[in-house]
Regions:
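Substrate-binding pocket helix/loop in short-chain dehydrogenase/reductase
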Residues: 103-104, 108-116, 209, 213
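Alpha-helical segment proximal to the catalytic Tyr-Lys
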Residues: 132, 177-181, 241
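C-terminal substrate-recognition "lid" of short-chain dehydrogenase/reductases
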Residues: 86, 221-250, 255
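Conserved glycine-rich cofactor-binding loop
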Residues: 13, 18-22
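Short, small/polar-rich loop/turn modules that mediate ligand/substrate recognition or access, typified
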Residues: 93, 180, 185, 243-245
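Short C-terminal tail/terminal secondary-structure segment
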Residues: 1-6, 153, 233, 244-265
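Active-site helix of classical SDR
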Residues: 127, 164, 172
Length: 265
């Protein structure tokens, strides 16, 4: 069941990093169903082609682009691919991310750098690469970055990811103010644990913590990928025309519950 008007995003062009799977793919699929043309960016060409095929099978317009968000020149290329294939770029979704559970005392410098590079540096590189095109969008440009509530709370084993996400939150607020004169809206979405994603599987299910973590959510369950996709549509659509510098928390109330030792992950 779709809750938005048909063709709500018609005429818009979106670039989604991490678009080959998980939340990035869910967002791209929903955008395409609502009329947006999409560029899917990721490092795994096979995943991107599979995702693009599924979107095309539903009538969507999509182009896969193999690239690493840690490489600024490659992100410039991704933006150029959007312009060359669809004539514009109106929406940037930063969904590429890296995370793993590791107590800080065991975290290697390389592990720290990897997450910071993908999450924080990658988000900045994508924003910078997209700026000149977003500022001439006829729909008012949108930047939507997927973060988590790790940046707002102290979660054991996630110092690296929490620091990266807090950095993205701060970056997004700064860009929201800096780029407001260009009518570019910069917002973030903070998902909670989402069923069917690699992150939830790796951090909770594979470690036998899924049932426990679901109980920590105020609504008593994990979210669905469509919950995050719907939030992204809201911010990308005319409903978000007066929203910038905001963080939309979509976690079923998870972050409001304290972290205790038996649910520290």
């Amino acid at each position: 069941m779709h809750i938005f008007a048909e063709r709500l995003l018609a005429g818009r062009v979106a670039l989604i990093t991490g678009g080959g799977s998980g939340l990035g793919f869910a967002i791209a699929r929903e955008f395409a169903l609502l009329g947006a043309a999409c560029v899917l960016v990721g490092r795994n060409g096979e995943k991107l082609e599979k995702a693009a095929f599924e979107i095309r099978s539903s009538g969507g317009r999509v182009v896969p682009y193999v690239g690493d968000v840690r490489d600024y020149s490659q992100m410039q290329g991704a933006v150029q691919a959007a312009v060359e294939n669809f004539g514009a770029l109106d929406i940037l979704v930063n969904s590429a991310a890296g995370n793993f559970y590791c107590p800080s005392k065991d975290l290697t410098p390389n592990g720290w750098r990897t997450v910071i590079d993908i999450d924080l540096n990658g988000t900045f590189f994508c924003c910078k690469a997209a700026f000149d095109v977003l500022r001439v969008s006829k729909f008012e440009g949108r930047v939507i970055s997927i973060v988590t509530t790790l940046g707002n709370t102290g979660w054991p084993g996630h110092a690296h990811a929490g620091a990266a996400k807090a950095g993205i939150l701060s970056l997004s607020r700064a860009l929201a103010v800096e780029w407001a004169e260009h009518q570019i809206h910069v917002n973030t979405i903070s998902p909670g644990p989402i069923a069917g994603t690699e992150g939830t599987s790796r951090l909770y299910e594979q470690r036998g913590l899924a049932e426990l973590q679901a109980r920590r959510v105020a609504l008593g369950r994990f979210g669905k990928t469509i919950d995050i996709a719907n939030a992204a549509v809201y911010l990308a659509s005319p409903a978000g025309d007066f929203i910038t510098g905001a963080d939309l928390v979509v976690d079923g109330g998870r972050w409001l519950n304290y972290v205790c030792k038996d649910s520290a992950a």
